[in-house]
A protein has these predicted regions:
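N-terminal export and membrane-targeting signals
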Residues: 1-17
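Metal-dependent phosphoester-hydrolase catalytic domains
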Residues: 38-42, 184-191, 196, 200, ...
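Active-site metal-binding loops of divalent metal-dependent hydrolases
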Residues: 64, 105-106, 183, 253, ...
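Generic beta-strand/beta-sheet core signal
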Residues: 176, 249-251, 307
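Residues that define the transmembrane beta-barrel architecture of outer-membrane proteins
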Residues: 231-233
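Active-site His/acidic residue clusters
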Residues: 244-268
């Protein structure tokens, strides 16, 4: 089915000024007859130019696979400017030049040591003639990956190892994440949800042991008292853009695979995605409590962008059927549908599972195994409707492009994921 149906823009033309103002205040969706595409031609927009800041804000997400197999190895690799993978992913970021970017699979190191080294030795140094980029603001926090739970969460009869951690990882912080920004981060207002328990989500899709008649009993009551929802964490990182605040909602749900018939990872992936759908939807957010004890989610007046490798494709792959639809079909969210010609070419050349996919390959963001699951749309930049989308794309060059060397084919010089970016115009005033 055509993907364009998912993009249900809310902002009306400049002539409908009252409707635009209502949208920014968090009113309900416009009727189909009054809505127009959020990506508009480059021209004067009258009232729209009075409402929105002139310069677009480029927001991106990038699973750069800058994880290592042992604690401390990433710091060692980034301590010099010579790590080839780090140079390559840094050049990808320099070529895309986002103002705000979420980096997934960047090992957490206390005090932000690895982040500082990556900025100093790679991003702030021109790679192959690409303009260096500077991100004076960064947010990094612990991840659930690799933290021992003390329980046999995968029910294999032993306690310990990555599968029994709160999030899969060989050491604490493996596969962590980072937010980098050219605009000030309101550090004092950041909210994290690392410790939120899965059982505390109403109607959670808790996994079921197929060997018993009882429902949702994969975990024991003792395990449910400690099992966390986030496989890494969920972050609400407010960023100041002019007089306006944009909430960067960052996460990296677990892959919906590497389990059994209980589908514990598929169900967790679904609920990790659902968390943001509830967080932006008052009063559904009432059950949410952050790590500091503050309850609730965003208000209807708050602007936001949901970022991250969600590990869920709307048409293909192994995720629960409606997992990513919880965001793509949420009335507060725009789906800019970023595309690339490189993804189309890769699908055709690689074949395999790609040949049987239902989704259009131009939306793919990850180059996975050709046998299964094939290439998928896994990475998302989803702005709220109070932001005006002007452009979007996926950094996936075709093979004939000189920049194809940055993405390549397996074994990848950078990552099996591609950087996804969206340009938005932010309101000029506080709501």
């Amino acid at each position: 089915m055509p993907r364009s149906a998912r993009f249900r823009p809310f902002l009306a033309t400049a002539a409908s000024g009252a409707l635009v103002l209502a949208a920014l205040a968090g009113a309900g969706p416009a009727s189909a007859s009054s809505a127009v595409p959020a990506t508009l031609p480059a021209r004067a927009h009258g009232l729209g130019d009075l409402i929105y800041q002139q310069k677009p804000l480029r927001v991106a997400t990038y699973n750069l696979s800058l994880n290592r197999g042992a604690a401390g190895q990433l710091v060692t690799d980034l301590s010099t400017p010579d790590d080839e993978q780090a140079k390559t992913v840094a050049e990808v970021i320099q070529r895309a030049a986002p103002d705000i970017v979420l980096l997934n699979e960047f090992d957490y190191v206390e005090a932000g040591v690895a982040v500082d080294l990556f900025r100093q030795n790679y991003l702030q140094v021109s790679q192959n003639g690409a303009p260096a980029v500077s991100y004076p603001y960064a947010f990094v926090a612990p991840s659930n990956t690799g933290i021992p739970s003390g329980y046999d969460l995968n029910n294999d009869g032993t306690v310990g190892g990555g599968d029994d951690a709160f999030g899969f990882g060989l050491f604490p912080g493996q596969y962590g994440m980072v937010v980098l920004s050219r605009h000030p981060i309101q550090t004092e207002n950041v909210r994290t949800f690392q410790n939120f328990l899965w059982r505390d989500m109403p109607g959670a899709l808790l996994p079921d042991d197929p060997a018993t008649a009882a429902p949702n009993d994969w975990f024991t009551p003792e395990e449910l008292a400690v099992v966390r929802l986030s496989s890494k964490s969920h972050w609400d990182v407010p960023v100041t853009v002019g007089p306006h605040t944009v909430h960067v909602l960052a996460s990296h749900p677990t892959p919906p695979t590497f389990d059994g018939p209980e589908d514990r990872n598929g169900r967790r992936n679904h609920d990790e995605i659902r968390f943001w759908a509830d967080y932006i939807s008052s009063p559904r957010s009432g059950y949410i409590v952050d790590d500091a004890g503050q309850k609730g989610g965003l208000t209807l007046k708050d602007s936001f962008v949901i970022l991250g490798d969600q590990n869920a494709d709307p048409r293909d792959g192994d995720s629960v059927d409606t997992a990513i639809d919880q965001l793509l079909e949420n009335w507060r969210i725009q789906d800019p549908l970023p595309t690339s010609s490189g993804a189309v070419e890769a699908s055709a050349v690689q074949g395999g599972a790609n040949a049987t996919h239902q989704g259009d390959p131009k939306y793919d963001t990850a180059d996975f195994a050709d046998t299964a699951p094939g290439n998928l749309r896994a990475d998302y930049v989803l702005p709220s409707r109070a932001l005006r989308v002007t452009d979007a794309g996926v950094f996936w060059p075709e093979q004939a492009d000189p920049l194809f060397r940055l993405t390549g084919v397996f074994p990848f010089p950078s990552s099996d994921h591609r950087l996804v970016w969206v340009d938005v115009r932010v309101p000029r005033f506080r709501l």
